[in-house]
Amino acid sequence: FGGGSMLKQEKLDTILEIVNTKGTITVKEIMNRLDISDMTARRYLQELADKDLLVRVHGGAEKLRTGSLLNNERSNVEKQGLQTAEKQEIARFAGHMVEERETIFIGPGTTLEFFARELSIDNIRVVTNSLPVFLILNERKLTDLILIGGNYRSITGAFVGTLTLQDIASLQFSKAFVSCNGIKDQAIATFSEDEGESQKLALENANKKYLLADHSKFDKFDFFTFYNISDIDTIITDSKLSDQTLLSLSKQTKIIKSKP
């Protein structure tokens, strides 16, 4: 990267990307990568540390551990009011992807809760580690509904951890539907490492892998990368995604914009 050609925010994003990918970054590395002075590199690190995006250590910085980020994670209740029209749009379209007699996995997240409401087929088996998704489908009196337990994360309503992973590992799915908090370059990321691990395993055990994400998730990082875009079969997003982003992602996987 040439120093002059990048905006400050891009430089900060680059530092975050490196530290979140590698786990650590040094001042020297930043100076070489971004073509900036020692003083500027240290100032940028301090700015990111002040925003609780990384941890300053001697000579550089480290990636935040999950516990330190908890205050920045939005709860399910907070997320329910965000991009609701877009999430409904995605959910309606994704609902048509499910066929009778399939076994599908639905992960945690408000977009997937909208998706659960749109499922109109009763002759399917649904496996989920999301309590909100389970409750929505249970109201529908879906006959073949499996809730996977484990450690409960009340902030998102998801079950995670060793028990959850053991259960998912023993199952196979026709299709897995997951969501995320950020998509940037090749990376699909979420806030919680535990939630990311369970989604990753479900995707690996599925014949078809679907990512449901509204336009606000694109070109954004989050704490834990759990999957690569090119390994997803189809991304379903809303009509507000820019054509430029659509074109760029189309080179890596199939991406569908739903209609309002």
Please report, for each region that a protein language model flagged, where it lies by residue.
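Glycine-rich beta-strand-to-loop/alpha-helix junction loops that act as flexible
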Residues: 107-109
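Short glycine/serine/threonine-rich phosphate/pyrophosphate-binding segments
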Residues: 111-115, 218-221
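Short, Lys/Arg-enriched N-terminal segments with co-localized hydrophobic residues
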Residues: 1-5
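HTH-adjacent hinge/linker in prokaryotic transcriptional regulators
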Residues: 7-10, 14-28, 32-33, 39, ...
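Conserved phosphate- and dinucleotide-binding cores of soluble alpha/beta proteins
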Residues: 7-10, 14-17, 27-29, 35, ...
